[in-house]
């Protein structure tokens, strides 16, 4: 069963996205990038994020969408801002695509590296290795989005 999966790593400065094709345990990276969010008012930043997501959905169709849940942060303002971005993303995905899967950062790290407390660099190393890529993927927002898509692909194989 050949599935096209969109993985998203939401952020308030950059939102990483990755498109993989998953088929019988083999995953192929189709595209990965960033939705860049310029410093501005929160309303305009959320608008930029949603417009970037619109563009991705206009250029591709997906069987599955997966998004990383927000991480715990010590700064309440940061948590609130990330929650607003994530809420806007969730609504946009529901409007365009419908249901989507959610994974915590710990679930993603565990699925990709085998360790829930892995560093971002360890995740990046394993993403590169799992996809058989020769070049490093930068920035880490993109690597995280790929990891989300890979986590969802693995989760689907377990459920099928």
Curated annotation (Swiss-Prot):
It is an enzyme of class 3 (hydrolase). This is Crossover junction endodeoxyribonuclease RuvC. One of its GO terms (biological process) is DNA repair. Its EC number is 3.1.21.10. Pfam families: RuvC. Mg(2+) 1 binds at residues 9, 141. The active site is at 9, 68, 141. GO terms for molecular function: crossover junction DNA endonuclease activity; DNA binding; magnesium ion binding. Transmembrane segments: none annotated. NCBIfam families: ruvC (TIGR00228). The RuvA-RuvB-RuvC complex processes Holliday junction (HJ) DNA during genetic recombination and DNA repair. Endonuclease that resolves HJ intermediates. Cleaves cruciform DNA by making single-stranded nicks across the HJ at symmetrical positions within the homologous arms, yielding a 5'-phosphate and a 3'-hydroxyl group; requires a central core of homology in the junction. The consensus cleavage sequence is 5'-(A/T)TT(C/G)-3'. Cleavage occurs on the 3'-side of the TT dinucleotide at the point of strand exchange. GO terms for cellular component: cytoplasm; Holliday junction resolvase complex. Belongs to the RuvC family. Its cofactor is Mg(2+). PROSITE patterns: RUVC. Its main location: cytoplasm. It is found in: Cytoplasm. Mg(2+) 2 binds at residue 68. Keywords: Cytoplasm, DNA damage, DNA recombination, DNA repair, DNA-binding, Endonuclease, Hydrolase, Magnesium, Metal-binding, Nuclease. Binds 2 Mg(2+) ion per subunit. The lineage of its organism: Bacteria, Pseudomonadati, Campylobacterota, Epsilonproteobacteria, Campylobacterales.
């Amino acid at each position: 069963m050949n599935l096209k999966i969109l993985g998203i790593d939401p952020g308030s400065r950059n939102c990483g996205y990755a498109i993989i094709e998953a088929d019988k345990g083999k995953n192929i990276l189709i595209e990965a990038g960033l939705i860049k969010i310029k410093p501005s008012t929160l309303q305009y930043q959320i608008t930029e994020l949603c417009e970037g997501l619109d563009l991705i959905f206009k250029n591709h169709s997906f069987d599955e969408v997966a998004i990383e849940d927000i991480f715990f942060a010590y700064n309440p303002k940061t948590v609130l801002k990330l929650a607003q971005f994530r809420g806007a993303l969730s609504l946009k995905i529901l409007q365009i695509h419908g249901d989507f899967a959610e994974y915590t950062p710990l679930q993603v790290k565990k699925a990709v590296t085998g360790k829930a407390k892995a560093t971002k660099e360890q995740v990046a190393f394993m993403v590169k290795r799992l996809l058989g890529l020769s070049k490093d993927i930068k920035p880490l927002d993109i690597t995280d989005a790929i990891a989300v898509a890979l986590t969802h692909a693995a989760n689907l194989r377990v459920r099928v």
